[in-house]
Amino acid sequence: MLPTTINSLMYIIPILIAVAFLTLMERKMLGYMQLRKGPNITGPYGLLQPIADGLKLFTKEPIRPLHTSPTLLISSPILALTTAMLIWTPIPMPYALTNLNLGLLSILAISSMAVNSILWAGWASNSKYAIIGSLRAVAQTISYEVTLGIILLSILILTGGFTMQLLTTTQEFTWLLTTSWPLAMMWFISTLAETNRAPFDLTEGESELVSGFNVEYAGGPFALFFLTEYANIIVMNLLTCILFISPGPPQHPELFLINLITKTMILSLSFLWIRASYPSFRYDQLMHLLWKQFLPLTMSLCLLHTSLPISTSGIPPLS
């Protein structure tokens, strides 16, 4: 029992530390892009800012408005963080916590479950702003999961299996980014929408919905939603890295880990750069982009990936 608990903690704590410093990186980057310093008081160069923010949020009194549903209100952020942590289990870094045969499929299934916590949070808040924000988030997440699923299917047809290790083996000689760059481009934009990041941050909608589905949250529960959002950003970028720009063969674990961290960091910084550079989309444009542009494109590319091995009599390797 004790080794299992320690093993899980050793997995969760580094993720939370990475999330904390990603928030600092975002504030620093936004600061420098707006010609200011960003956090620079707490600790050397402001490095202790995320720890101070965390302490402040978790020691604040959790205010619960009278009209809310208490059980769902508290369980939603806990469920959100649990699902965000569960997604990490099948990811090889270079060894996965649980080596699943259907690793990619399980990641897709767990990420779909995260929608429930957002919907519950909006409904339990009993506020019109929160429910509109949560409905937007659910519609957006479910819609973009369609393209993510089709892109994953196309990649799986190329690799010939559902395991994450097979992806690194397939990319020993060339990255899948070079052969499937339209899919990689659409995948990256879909991950932005899936994680509700700018320019697709319509769930927050500061000008109209105050803060979206988490408007009634304060203190600890709000911090849990905050951690969930940034953990999802990192895990999506990890997935992008493994799918399209392989970190290398797992036979060299140290090199694999350094490569994986570096590439994930570059992708995460591009998320922050996009937030600082682009204005928000209108909601109809967001849905138009998916249903009228991405969906036909991904489906046609999926058909192409399916027909190519058959037409050239080259059946993918069976694991």
Swiss-Prot record:
GO BP field: aerobic respiration
Cellular compartments annotated: Mitochondrion inner membrane
EC number: 7.1.1.2
HAMAP family: NDH1_NuoH
Family stated for the protein in its record: Belongs to the complex I subunit 1 family.
Recorded topology in the membrane: Multi-pass membrane protein
Record-level GO cellular component terms: mitochondrial inner membrane
Free-text function comment from the UniProt entry: Core subunit of the mitochondrial membrane respiratory chain NADH dehydrogenase (Complex I) that is believed to belong to the minimal assembly required for catalysis. Complex I functions in the transfer of electrons from NADH to the respiratory chain. The immediate electron acceptor for the enzyme is believed to be ubiquinone.
GO MF annotation terms: NADH dehydrogenase (ubiquinone) activity
Organism of provenance: Varanus flavescens
PANTHER family in the cross-refs: NADH DEHYDROGENASE SUBUNIT 1 (PTHR11432), NADH-UBIQUINONE OXIDOREDUCTASE CHAIN 1 (PTHR11432:SF3)
Reaction(s) this enzyme catalyzes, per UniProt: a ubiquinone + NADH + 5 H(+)(in) = a ubiquinol + NAD(+) + 4 H(+)(out)
Keyword Chaperone among UniProt keywords: no
InterPro entries: NADH_UbQ_OxRdtase_su1/FPO (IPR001694), NADH_UbQ_OxRdtase_su1_CS (IPR018086)
Keywords of this entry: Electron transport, Membrane, Mitochondrion, Mitochondrion inner membrane, NAD, Respiratory chain, Translocase, Transmembrane, Transmembrane helix, Transport, Ubiquinone
Protein name: NADH-ubiquinone oxidoreductase chain 1
Transmembrane regions: 5-25, 72-92, 102-122, 146-166, 173-193, 225-245, 254-274, 295-315
